[in-house]
């Protein structure tokens, strides 16, 4: 017992000495029992601290609750728009008026309503809560894209009419370049295709792969849509071509005015240069009687003495016309007279002459104007040729660049093919149907193009004989094989 007590006292004194030693700066090794207790205290303290840190604070609790309520409310709003419950949708929208909630795909309430064809929800969202009709998803889809679906065959048309009335983008493209017309054609919805085309959809729009709506008709074998689109594309092309031709007519009148002004300035400059050259020549001569004024008056008198017929013939007969001749050839820009509307008079048809006597009125008139051209040269083109004033260059898009001789570029140029622009601006280079007398020459049948040329190794006689026969007997087949150089077929052996 004494040893045990002394041992305990030594342990206690050792512990006390160790604490005092720590106070003095000495650091003896601690006992194992003290280290275990100290470790347990530290671990308990750390556990309690972690629990305190994990326990939410009151402010964070309120924020998390608000976020959860907002997410649930937005989910209810999207679900109400999808099922078409208008009252539930109004209740959810009245609770969140700050921003438009979306899901992970970027869909909002108007997208879900359009995807399910809920017209009442669309009207509430657009008219009462001012949702934009061209709101985009993450894939750049608009409500007009989503309403065109094969499941909405019966409800798609009213929704399309409503969205178009509210200003929906008719040719909006998704991230793949698809327009609403592409989707309607792919689904084979002919009524939707008609509504979109009649509203002004671009029938030549291309997606990211370069496909047009008519190409989707061919891929999915929608013949009715293809037939309608083909007719719409033809009408669109003709309308655009007529519009561009009207622009071309206006451009030609502007070019004629530009050429006229250019030739006037060119004539003035050359007149000044000629007078300066004549004055220099006269100063170099030793004839004082020659004066510039008399020569100028004489030249003007000579020019004025020419008749208009002689001036017109000079324009057409000269191979290199002068500036004056070119000015006479340019049609003068004149203002169109205002149309005068007169009251139409009703004329009764004349009575038929029932008499056989041609001398009695009304006398029969059988003469008519000469309609056959007797000349051998083609008639001159009534259109003005701009080849001496304008240069036409093709561009890489199939159109043309117009450049004048005085260094100006003409813009804008009508969107017409290069061949059409060249034919309209250079009518003199237009090929004629037949040039007389070069157009009259004999044509041999050997020069007529054929599908294939029959050579010596072609047995066309055998083919003709086979087409003319009704049955192929053994004798005929043997003759054909011998003609072609083939061995005869062995005769069939009859089994006894």
Curated annotation (Swiss-Prot):
- What Pfam family is a match, any one? Ank_2
What post-translational events are described?
Answer: Phosphorylated during mitosis.
Main localization category: cytoplasm
Cellular component terms per the entry's GO annotation = cytoplasm; spindle; spindle pole
| Keyword Disulfide bond part of the UniProt annotation | no
Name the residue ranges with Low complexity bias: 1-15
Q: Which compartments does it reside in?
A: Cytoplasm, Cytoskeleton, Spindle; Cytoplasm, Cytoskeleton, Spindle pole
The segments labelled Disordered in the record are 1-66, 292-320
Keyword check for Cytoplasm, yes or no.
Answer: yes
GO BP terms: cell division; mitotic metaphase chromosome alignment; positive regulation of microtubule polymerization; regulation of mitotic cytokinesis; regulation of mitotic spindle organization
Task: Identify the SMART domains for this entry.
Answer: ANK
- Give UniProt keywords alphabetically: ANK repeat, Cell cycle, Cell division, Cytoplasm, Cytoskeleton, Mitosis, Phosphoprotein, Repeat
Can you tell which superkingdom this protein's organism belongs to?
Eukaryota
ANK repeats span which residues?
Answer: 105-135, 139-172, 176-205
Biased composition annotated in UniProt, kind: Basic and acidic residues: 51-60
Q: What does this protein do?
A: Required for normal progression through mitosis. Involved in chromosome alignment and cytokinesis via regulation of microtubules polymerization.
Subunit structure and binding partners:
Interacts with PSRC1; recruited by PSRC1 to the spindle during mitosis.
What is the name of the protein in this document?
Ankyrin repeat domain-containing protein 53
Instruction: Give the organism, scientific name.
Output: Macaca fascicularis
